[in-house]
Amino acid sequence: MREALVVGGASGIGLAIALQLAERADYCIVHIVDRAQLPEDICHEKFRCHQFDLTSEDYAFFDRFGNIDTLMITAGFGHLALFKDLTEDYIVNIMNVNATAVMRLVSRFYDRIASSGDFYCGVMVSIAGFMSSPFFSVYGASKAALKIFIESVNVELEKAGFSNRILNVSPGSIKGTGFSQGKTDLALTEGLAKDIIQHLESKDDLFIPQYEEVFKTVLQRYHDDFRAEGRHSYD
């Protein structure tokens, strides 16, 4: 029987993924780690809930999850704002939670990822990590750091002869999540959660939801003239 760990799983897409995994017969335990508590109206017999602040210095907390074969990192935050309106504390916190914490978690489980046994690892990144926008300057920078980090580690894994990969999930705006102080609505995130799990278990390295419908054109415009696309996003 399998165990999963969802970091940031108390709300939003993380909770939707945790619920999907818990409904499957092959998973016996789904660990949820979040700074916040799981909502009282959400419960599942397979859930094991733990509270942890990703800005903490000591990550030995995660040594207890030695039996997992699935790691999904969905923790992160951000909101629309120009750089001039961001505080220095906000800059430090968003880089720590969105980027540094993910790298530390991957480091903790790297021996499991870089092995011949199946290990499924995914990270919620963002389409903001692929392009510039004045309203996502630091948020986008934190996600761009993850994009390059994941791509680099995946090449390292490939060259070492391992089949496991880290999945970069880079959506645009997701309805039903807590981004920009939104509220969790599991009815709106269920479909995306299923798609993410499918790509995770296929050991894909990149999943951009609505790529053909929306983001293929946007990314091409950005590639053609990133300055013009930045001005377009500002307007």
Regions inferred by a protein language model and the residue ranges of each:
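Conserved glycine-rich Rossmann-like NAD(P)H-binding loop of the short-chain dehydrogenase/reductase
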Residues: 26-40
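Conserved NAD(P)H cofactor-binding loop of Rossmann-fold oxidoreductase domains
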Residues: 74-80
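Substrate-binding pocket helix/loop in short-chain dehydrogenase/reductase
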Residues: 82-83, 90-93
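Residue(s) in the substrate-gating loop at a strand-loop-helix junction
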Residues: 126
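C-terminal helical subdomain
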Residues: 164, 168, 180-221
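N-terminal Rossmann NAD(P)H-binding glycine-rich loop of SDR-like oxidoreductase domains
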Residues: 10, 18
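Active-site helix of classical SDR
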Residues: 106, 142
